[in-house]
């Protein structure tokens, strides 16, 4: 039987993008399955580089997660200036030059996000006033959106020349390792802790001079993340070979008074008491949380007035403390965490009942703060639907009458 005259072959009806769409879905699913835990620990290295010389001013490595590995970075202003700077007579080649650099203010402008009119690398992204977001100057430059803040460290202004302690006696005032006496402290802002650091970020730094051109240098900040080792699947603990269910309370039997043996009978050896039942795996985890509570209650008793102790069930295992506050996402603690309510009386095993009780109290408090009109809408869904169903045609009818009146 012949097909319709205008039917296309089957291969023409297949979407050519179909395989790519399926491949993208599979890749996305694979990425979601392999998503790292927020508690995963990495070897994080932060590196500050002088882009004018290519030298590293600071390289700090630490172990931490992707959300908390934001340390303070310490380096020297001379690591960014170099021996000679921008044909201005400034530089850090001599102790006197290093001392003179300490007398100038400086300001920093971002190169990762350059506002209009702030120029390029030649101007250090500081083409006009107002581009600076941080620094150490009398007008106190600051920003609410930049990723870092850069300030001077704690060095006395009246310190003498910055002698190199390896070249002269360390007893000389102002002698430091390498002649470094212009310490800087780089800190991450809240925006910087939330930003993506997949690539390097660039900033320009300029010394403020009352006359002449302010000299320019540029530096970059990069983050390198390395796994601390292969993630080996974790199975049952070989030390704990008796993975038992939670132990049940044993009924205590009152001891019977001993009866004297009949005359002429041999002495009876008393039977040994049966060994006590070992605690199960659940009891051991509860004891772990209870031990954490006791340690917390002894060290920080103010934190245990009203809190939750949570044990993350997925490796690596962590214990945390959550102080009660204004939180609305109550289901987030039910993913991979086992939480127990605690106060000064101790750990509450029946935590879900406590949670339901507190949720009920909060719901009643919320309902008591509502007005009668809002409460009517929340309680009567059919009334809400009826109101909106009637309001629509009424508005249209009123508009028709209004236009009819205006044109008549």
Swiss-Prot record:
Cited PANTHER family: BC035947 PROTEIN-RELATED (PTHR10424:SF72), VIRAL ENVELOPE PROTEIN (PTHR10424)
GO CC annotation terms, alphabetical: host cell endoplasmic reticulum membrane; host cell plasma membrane; membrane; viral envelope; virion membrane
Glycosylation sites: 43, 58, 297, 329, 378
Protein task: Envelope-like membrane glycoprotein.
Superkingdom to which the source organism belongs: Viruses
UniProt xrefs under SUPFAM superfamilies: ENV polyprotein, receptor-binding domain
Intravirion domain ranges by topology: 407-408
Topology class, membrane: Single-pass type I membrane protein
The protein, known as: Glycoprotein 55
Note: Compared to other gammaretroviruses which possess 2 envelope proteins (gp70 and p15E), RSFFV gp55 corresponds to a gp70-p15E fusion protein with a deletion of a portion of p15E. It is encoded by the defective env gene of the virus.
Regions annotated as coiled coil: 335-371
Transmembrane annotation, as ranges: 386-406
GO biological process, any: virion attachment to host cell
Annotated signal sequence range: 1-32
Residue ranges of the region described as Disordered: 256-281
Virion surface topology ranges: 33-385
Subcellular location: Host endoplasmic reticulum membrane; Host cell membrane; Virion membrane
Keywords noted in UniProt: Coiled coil, Fusion of virus membrane with host cell membrane, Fusion of virus membrane with host membrane, Glycoprotein, Host cell membrane, Host endoplasmic reticulum, Host membrane, Host-virus interaction, Membrane, Signal, Transmembrane, Transmembrane helix, Viral attachment to host cell, Viral envelope protein, Viral penetration into host cytoplasm, Virion, Virus entry into host cell
Chain's gene name: env
């Amino acid at each position: 039987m012949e097909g319709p005259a205008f039917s296309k072959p089957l291969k023409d009806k297949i979407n050519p993008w179909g395989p790519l769409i399926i491949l993208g879905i599979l890749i996305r699913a694979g990425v979601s399955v392999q998503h790292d835990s927020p508690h995963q620990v990495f070897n994080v290295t932060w590196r500050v580089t002088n882009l004018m010389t290519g030298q590293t001013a600071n390289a700090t490595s630490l172990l931490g997660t992707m959300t908390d590995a934001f340390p303070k970075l310490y380096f020297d202003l001379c690591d960014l200036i170099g021996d000679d700077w921008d044909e201005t007579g400034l530089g850090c080649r001599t102790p006197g030059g290093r001392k003179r650099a300490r007398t100038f203010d400086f300001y920093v402008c971002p190169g990762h996000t350059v506002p209009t009119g702030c120029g390029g690398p030649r101007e250090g992204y500081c083409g006009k006033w107002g581009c600076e977001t941080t620094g150490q100057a009398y007008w106190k430059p600051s920003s609410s959106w930049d990723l870092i803040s850069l300030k001077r460290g704690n060095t006395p202004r009246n310190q003498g020349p910055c002698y190199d302690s390896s070249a002269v006696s360390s007893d000389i005032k102002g002698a430091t390792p390498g002649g470094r006496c212009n310490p800087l402290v780089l800190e991450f802002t809240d925006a910087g802790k939330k930003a993506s650091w997949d690539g390097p970020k660039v900033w320009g730094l300029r010394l403020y001079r009352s006359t002449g051109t302010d000299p320019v240098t540029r530096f970059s900040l990069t983050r390198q993340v390395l796994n601390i080792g292969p993630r080996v699947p974790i199975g049952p603990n070989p030390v704990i070979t008796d993975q038992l269910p939670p132990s049940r309370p044993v009924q205590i039997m009152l001891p019977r008074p001993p009866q004297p043996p009949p005359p002429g009978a041999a002495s009876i050896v008393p039977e040994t008491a049966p060994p006590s039942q070992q605690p199960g795996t659940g009891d051991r985890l509860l004891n772990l949380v209870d031990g954490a509570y006791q340690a917390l209650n002894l060290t920080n008793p103010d934190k245990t007035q009203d809190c939750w102790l949570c044990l993350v069930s997925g490796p690596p295992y962590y214990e945390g403390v959550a102080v009660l506050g204004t939180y609305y996402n109550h289901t987030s603690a039910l993913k991979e965490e086992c939480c127990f309510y605690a106060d000064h009386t101790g750990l509450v095993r029946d935590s879900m009942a406590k949670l339901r009780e507190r949720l009920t109290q909060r719901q009643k408090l919320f309902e008591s703060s509502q007005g009668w009109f809002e409460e009517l809408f929340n309680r009567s869904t059919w009334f809400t639907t009826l109101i909106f169903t009637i309001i629509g045609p009424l508005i249209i009818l009123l508009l028709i009458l209004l236009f009819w009146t205006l044109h008549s």
